[in-house]
C-alpha cells in the first residue's frame, strides 16, 4: 500500500475531525459520491489532505480554473512534500482552434502557443500515475480532453538496466522513435547528445535531472542522474525508464494501419461530396488530407494529427476519447473543488466543440472522423469517474441529487463565525457605502464591493476615488496575472477597496477583508442567486469583524435563502464556541502571490550566491511583466543567457539565471 506522509503542525479542529471520519468511512463503505459542505475558511483542503493520507489512494483534484488549481497545487505540495504532487492543466498560453465561418467564407487556421514548462509538468503527472501509488494530480477541466491512450503510450516506453546488452545505434533509433532529437550543442528537454560511448539523455518529463548512459562495447556499464546545467552527478541508478516526448507518440505499425483506414474514409467521403455536387469541398478535403498523410508517412506526425486520433488509438466511431481518467488506477479518488462551478463546466465542453467541428466537416476541411477528437460527454465522464468527493460551500443540484452522504464542515478551527448580514435600502447605497468605507479604512481593514455590470464598477471606482478613497476595480478584461497582483496589493494595504462583479468569489483567501458590500442585491439573476450571494458573503468570513451589507429595496427568494443558510451556520458556530469555550481568533496569512504558493518542479531549494547585477536587472523586469507572452519572452531570453553561461563554465551565474526562470514559471502557472 502506498504511503502518504502528511506534513503539518496543525491537528484537525472544529468540524474537521468528524468530517474526515465520515468521508473516510463513506469511501471504505464504497459510496460513489459524497459532498463536503464546508464553509469558507473551514479548512476544506486540510480535511481532504487528511482523508488522502488515511485512505492511501492516488487522487485527482479537479479545480474550476488555473488560479485555484495553482493555489491547490501549492497547498498539497506543502502538505505532501515527500509524495508525487503533480500539476495537469492546459499547456496552451494561447489557443485559437481552427474554424470556418460560412457567411463570410473565412477559414481560421489553428494557432497556438504551447508552454513548454506546463507540457513537461503534464508528462510528469502521467508518469507519476503510471509508476507510483502515492500520486496527487491537481487538474482543471482540461482533464476531460483527448490524450494519447495509456496502452499506446506504455508500449513506447524504453527501459534501460545497468548491465543490459545494448547496441548504441539501436538506442539512438529508439530515442528517435520517442520523438527525442539529437543536439550536441544545446542540451534541452527531450534531446540527447552523444560523446563517444557516453549518451546524455534529457527526459521529456524532467525539469531537474538528465540521465547519462555509459557503454562499454555493447554493455550498459553505468547509469547516472546528473544536473544538466552543471554536469554534477547526483546519484547512480540501477535502471531507468524513458517516456515519449508527447502523449500522442504512435508506434510505426499503428501509424501505417491508421493511414490505410484514413485513405478508406477519405475515398468514401469524396464520393459522397461529389454525389452532392460539392466539388469545391471535395477538392479541398482531398488536398488537405493527402498532405497530412504525406507528413505522417515522412515525419511520423502532422499538424492537427489529433483530428485522426480515432484511428491512431483504434477506437470505433463515437467511442469516448482516451483522457487523463484512463491513466487513473481503478482505486483512485476524485475530489472536485468548488463543485457547483466545476461540474457544470464538464457538461458544457462537449457541445461547443461539436458545433465548430460539424461546420469544418460539412465544408470539406476535415473528415467526419474528426468529430471523435473531442472532450468527453457528461454521461461518459460520469461512467468513468472513480469514487468522488464534491467540495463546496454551496453545492449545486447535481451534488444534492447524487451525493450518498453530505458531510458538513461548518465550524471553523479558528472559532470564526459567518459574517453578520445587514439589509439596507438601495436608494442611498453609494453614500452609505462611502461612510462604511471610511470607518473600515480608519481601522486598516479592507472592503469588497460587488456590482452588477462592468460599467457600474468603473463608475463607482471613479466616484469613490474622487472622494479620496484608495480603490481599484477587477473584472474579466484584466488578465489573470494582473488580477492576482491586484488582490495581493489589496492585502498589502496599497489600497483599501476592491470593486468587482463576479470575480470576488470562490477560493479568494483575503483575511484582511472585514466588509463585503453587495449593491442591488434584490436584482434576481445569475449574479444574485442564493449561491452567488453565499459565496460573496463568505469573503468576509476570515475576519474577526466580518460583516456583509446587502443593499436592496425588497427581499428576494435568493436573498431569503442565502440569509437563512448563513444564519443557520452562524447559530451552529456560536453554539459550538460556547460549548467548548472557544474565543474566535482572526486568520493571519503571509501575503504572497498565489503563484508563489505553487512550488514548481525546477525551482531548486539550494541557495545560490551569484551575480548581484543580474539579480537587480531581473527584479526590475519582474515588475514590468504582465501578460503571459511577455513572461514567456523573458523566460526564453533568460534561458539563452543561462545556456551560454553554462557553455562558458560560469555555473554560479547560470544557476542564478535558472532560479529567476523558476520564479517566472511560477507566475505563469495561474495564467
Curated annotation (Swiss-Prot):
Residues 614-624 have a biased composition (Basic and acidic residues). One of its GO terms (molecular function) is ATP binding. Residues 601-624 are annotated as: Disordered. CDD domains: DEXHc_UvrB, SF2_C_UvrB. Residues 632-667 form the UVR domain. Residues 429-582 form the Helicase C-terminal domain. The keyword Flavoprotein does not apply. It comes from the Bacteria. Its main location: cytoplasm. InterPro entries: Helicase/UvrB_N (IPR006935), Helicase_ATP-bd (IPR014001), Helicase_C-like (IPR001650), P-loop_NTPase (IPR027417), UVR_dom (IPR001943), UVR_dom_sf (IPR036876), UvrB (IPR004807), UvrB_inter (IPR041471). It is found in: Cytoplasm. One of its GO terms (biological process) is nucleotide-excision repair. Keywords: ATP-binding, Cytoplasm, DNA damage, DNA excision, DNA repair, Excision nuclease, Nucleotide-binding, SOS response. GO terms for cellular component: cytoplasm; excinuclease repair complex. Belongs to the UvrB family. PANTHER family: UVRABC SYSTEM PROTEIN B. This is UvrABC system protein B. It comes from Pseudomonas syringae pv. syringae (strain B728a).
Amino acid at each position: 500500500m502506498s504511503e502518504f506522509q502528511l506534513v503539518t503542525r496543525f491537528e484537525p479542529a472544529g468540524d474537521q475531525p468528524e468530517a474526515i471520519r465520515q468521508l473516510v468511512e463513506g469511501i471504505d463503505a464504497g459510496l460513489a459520491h459524497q459532498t463536503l459542505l464546508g464553509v469558507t475558511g473551514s479548512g476544506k483542503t486540510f480535511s481532504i489532505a487528511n482523508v488522502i493520507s488515511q485512505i492511501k489512494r492516488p487522487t485527482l483534484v479537479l479545480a474550476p480554473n488555473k488560479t485555484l488549481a495553482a493555489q491547490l497545487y501549492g497547498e498539497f505540495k506543502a502538505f505532501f512534500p515527500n509524495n508525487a504532487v503533480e500539476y495537469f492543466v492546459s499547456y496552451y498560453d494561447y489557443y485559437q482552434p481552427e474554424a470556418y465561418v460560412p457567411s463570410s467564407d473565412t477559414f481560421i487556421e489553428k494557432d497556438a502557443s504551447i508552454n513548454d514548462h506546463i507540457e513537461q509538468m503534464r508528462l510528469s503527472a502521467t508518469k507519476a500515475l503510471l509508476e507510483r501509488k502515492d500520486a496527487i494530480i491537481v487538474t482543471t477541466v482540461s482533464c476531460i480532453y483527448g490524450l494519447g491512450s495509456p496502452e499506446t503510450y506504455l508500449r513506447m516506453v524504453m527501459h534501460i538496466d545497468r548491465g543490459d546488452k545494448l547496441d548504441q545505434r539501436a538506442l539512438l533509433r529508439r530515442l528517435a522513435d520517442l520523438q527525442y532529437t539529437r543536439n550536441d550543442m544545446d542540451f534541452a528537454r527531450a534531446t540527447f547528445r552523444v560523446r563517444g560511448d557516453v549518451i546524455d539523455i534529457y527526459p521529456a518529463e524532467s525539469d531537474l535531472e538528465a540521465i547519462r548512459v555509459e557503454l562499454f562495447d555493447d554493455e550498459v556499464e553505468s547509469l547516472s542522474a546528473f544536473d544538466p546545467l552543471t554536469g554534477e552527478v547526483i546519484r547512480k541508478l540501477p535502471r531507468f525508464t524513458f517516456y515519449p516526448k508527447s502523449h500522442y507518440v504512435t508506434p510505426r505499425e499503428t501509424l501505417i494501419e491508421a493511414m490505410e483506414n484514413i485513405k478508406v474514409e477519405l475515398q468514401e467521403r469524396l464520393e459522397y461530396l461529389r454525389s452532392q455536387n460539392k466539388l469545391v469541398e471535395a477538392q479541398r478535403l482531398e488536398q488537405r488530407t493527402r498532405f497530412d498523410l504525406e507528413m505522417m508517412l515522412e515525419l511520423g506526425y502532422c499538424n492537427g494529427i489529433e483530428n485522426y486520433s480515432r484511428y491512431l488509438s483504434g477506437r470505433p466511431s463515437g467511442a469516448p476519447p482516451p483522457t487523463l481518467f484512463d491513466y487513473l488506477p481503478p482505486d483512485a479518488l476524485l475530489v472536485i473543488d468548488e463543485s457547483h462551478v466545476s461540474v457544470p463546466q464538464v457538461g458544457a465542453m462537449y457541445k461547443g466543440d461539436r458545433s465548430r467541428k460539424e461546420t469544418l466537416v460539412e465544408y470539406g476541411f476535415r473528415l467526419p472522423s474528426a468529430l471523435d477528437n473531442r472532450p468527453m460527454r457528461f454521461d461518459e465522464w460520469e461512467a468513468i469517474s472513480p469514487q468522488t468527493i464534491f467540495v463546496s460551500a454551496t453545492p449545486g443540484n447535481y451534488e444534492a441529487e447524487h451525493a450518498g452522504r453530505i458531510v458538513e464542515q461548518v465550524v471553523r478551527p479558528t472559532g470564526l463565525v459567518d459574517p453578520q448580514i445587514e439589509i439596507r435600502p438601495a436608494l442611498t447605497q453609494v453614500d452609505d457605502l462611502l461612510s462604511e468605507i471610511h470607518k473600515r479604512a480608519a481601522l486598516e481593514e479592507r472592503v469588497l464591493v460587488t456590482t452588477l455590470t462592468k460599467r457600474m464598477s468603473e463608475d463607482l471606482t471613479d466616484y469613490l476615488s474622487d472622494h479620496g478613497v484608495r480603490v481599484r476595480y477587477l473584472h474579466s478584461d484584466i488578465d489573470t496575472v494582473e488580477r492576482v497582483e491586484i488582490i495581493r496589493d489589496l492585502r498589502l494595504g496599497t489600497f483599501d477597496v476592491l470593486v468587482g462583479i463576479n470575480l470576488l468569489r470562490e477560493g479568494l483567501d483575503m483575511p484582511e477583508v472585514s466588509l463585503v458590500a453587495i449593491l442591488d442585491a434584490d436584482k434576481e439573476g445569475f449574479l444574485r442567486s442564493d449561491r452567488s450571494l453565499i459565496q460573496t458573503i463568505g469573503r468576509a468570513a476570515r475576519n474577526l469583524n466580518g460583516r456583509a451589507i446587502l443593499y436592496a429595496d425588497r427581499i428576494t427568494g435568493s436573498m431569503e435563502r442565502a440569509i437563512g443558510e448563513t444564519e443557520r451556520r452562524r447559530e451552529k458556530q456560536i453554539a459550538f464556541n460556547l460549548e467548548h469555550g472557544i474565543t474566535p481568533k482572526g486568520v493571519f496569512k503571509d501575503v504572497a502571490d498565489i503563484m508563489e504558493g505553487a512550488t514548481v518542479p525546477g525551482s531548486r531549494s539550494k541557495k545560490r550566491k551569484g551575480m548581484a547585477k543580474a539579480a537587480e536587472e531581473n527584479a526590475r523586469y519582474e515588475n514590468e511583466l504582465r501578460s503571459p507572452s511577455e513572461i514567456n519572452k523573458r523566460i526564453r531570453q533568460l534561458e539563452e543567457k543561462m545556456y551560454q553561461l553554462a557553455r562558458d563554465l560560469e555555473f554560479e551565474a547560470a544557476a542564478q539565471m535558472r532560479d529567476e526562470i523558476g520564479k517566472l514559471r511560477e507566475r505563469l502557472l495561474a495564467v
